[in-house]
Amino acid sequence: MSSKCDVVVVGGGISGMAAAKLLHDSGLNVIVLEARDRVGGRTYTLRNQKVKYVDLGGSYVGPTQNHILRLSKELGLETYKVNEVERLIHHTKGKSYPFRGSFPSVWNPITYLDHNNLWRTMDDMGREIPSDAPWKAPLAEQWDLMTMKELLDKICWTESSKQLAILFVNLCVTAEIHEVSALWFLWYVKQCGGTTRIFSTSNGGQERKFVGGSGQVSERIMDLLGDRVKLERPVIHIDQTGENVLVETLNHELYEAKYVISAVPPVLGMKIHFNPPLPMMRNQLITRVPLGSVIKSIVYYKEPFWRNMDYCGSMIIEGEEAPVAYALDDTKPDGSYPAIIGFILAHKARKLARLTKEERLKKLCDLYAKVLGSQEALHPVHYEEKNWCEEQYSGGCYTSYFPPGIMTQYGRVLRQPVGRIYFAGTETATHWSGYMEGAVEAGERAAREILHAMGKIPEDEIWLPEPESVDVPAKPITTTFLQRHLPSVPGLLKLIGLTTIFSATALGFLAHKRGLLVRI
């Protein structure tokens, strides 16, 4: 006996729940099938007496992320700003350098030129890549066959800019520079608003968090949908051969629907049997886009001692020996539960996973003591962590990455429906893909695709512009005249070389005219 509905949504993360809410609000009968014993997917808010609440998964929202800001406001959630009142720290070559702003200060003029050229070049290349179709970029194939390592080897002249660029890639996509396609990474940064927007706290992707945690987004939608959300129901089979689509779960329940939305990471499609089989390109795509590796760590202290030292808690930490590359203040907005959240990224997540939880905590405390220059960092009162690589119903975090050559070959099928199956999930977004914002955009777009297929809305209403959030307005990202026009290091050397040749030629000509050159 099967349960009948209009649409089955596979996956109860933010994308699936946003899709289900829109369809429900449009008068359709929706059922959400979630494999875990909770909703939220790659967002997860843990609650206990030691932490009150803490986001162990996706957490940050900021300006230009208007879908998630609108949805969360509808659900009655509020945001607060991540602390960045005091100074940030850039720790490199064993020393800490305080700074303010989005990027670390650079005083060496040659190094400054190289850093400036790095960010400018990535943004310039990104502007050539269409957000909704990166494979259509003029140099798409050339850039897609190149790893970010190869690109950075071409762009970076100094070791300083190279190391910061490696950290930037690790942090943005939780993968190594040799693992990801240059085309895909440049697209990823571009569709998040560029290097400054994605890297910044204030006026950037990490500006805010939700009071009470981001897990509430999915939880409050579940409250609205009631028993239409079925937990502990991993989907194992989708059959489209009949009049309706049949969806079977691991506990052998059957659900019958007119349409299905798959709102799980593409690779998790491999856990589902399809009848008829998936088309060739979709079948191969899902084997080729792994997720990144990250352990999220939160160290709690009695006091936010770093603030007393005029540090906000934001730390950019270079070096192979440092377990964490990036840290932020995670103290509650009322000042309670002082904490530092650190991201253990890419190969370091795989390396440190071999240690015990206690050993990881000690390494983190030792690092923070060194970077902050305070022994107080050695005395935590509590510790929480989440290794997303262990999650069988995520496969990793934050998002799926594209190795070289995959985007141009398979990217077109990411959002392409397969019969009556439509695809959501943050990976399929065109703006802030990889974030909660992208998850909402993708879920609502997939829902509207079904509404259009049912004849309820015209095709031009599938993709709708999202008005800017009134509560979290975006300030434009600006660059100075010098930042736009300063030469790169090779450009400067070429300029010096040409100037030297020109000067020598001019002096020779002048000497000749005045008869100062002696004939032999």
Swiss-Prot record:
Family to which the UniProt record says this protein belongs: Belongs to the flavin monoamine oxidase family.
GO cellular component: mitochondrial outer membrane; mitochondrion
Major site of localization recorded for this protein: mitochondrion
N-acetylserine modifications at: S2
Cytoplasmic side: 2-489
Catalysed reaction equations from the record: a secondary aliphatic amine + O2 + H2O = a primary amine + an aldehyde + H2O2; a primary methyl amine + O2 + H2O = an aldehyde + H2O2 + NH4(+); benzylamine + O2 + H2O = benzaldehyde + H2O2 + NH4(+); (R)-adrenaline + O2 + H2O = (R)-3,4-dihydroxymandelaldehyde + methylamine + H2O2
Enzyme Commission number(s): 1.4.3.21, 1.4.3.4
Transmembrane segments: 490-516
Pfam families named among the record's database cross-references: Amino_oxidase
Membrane topology: Single-pass type IV membrane protein
UniProt-recorded name of the protein: Amine oxidase [flavin-containing] B
Superkingdom classification of source: Eukaryota
Cofactor(s) the protein requires to work: FAD
Subcellular location: Mitochondrion outer membrane
GO molecular function, one term: primary methylamine oxidase activity
Modified residues (N6-acetyllysine): K52
S-8alpha-FAD cysteine: residues carrying this PTM: C397
Topological domains annotated Mitochondrial intermembrane: 517-520
Keyword field contains Cytoplasm: no
Uppermost EC category: oxidoreductase
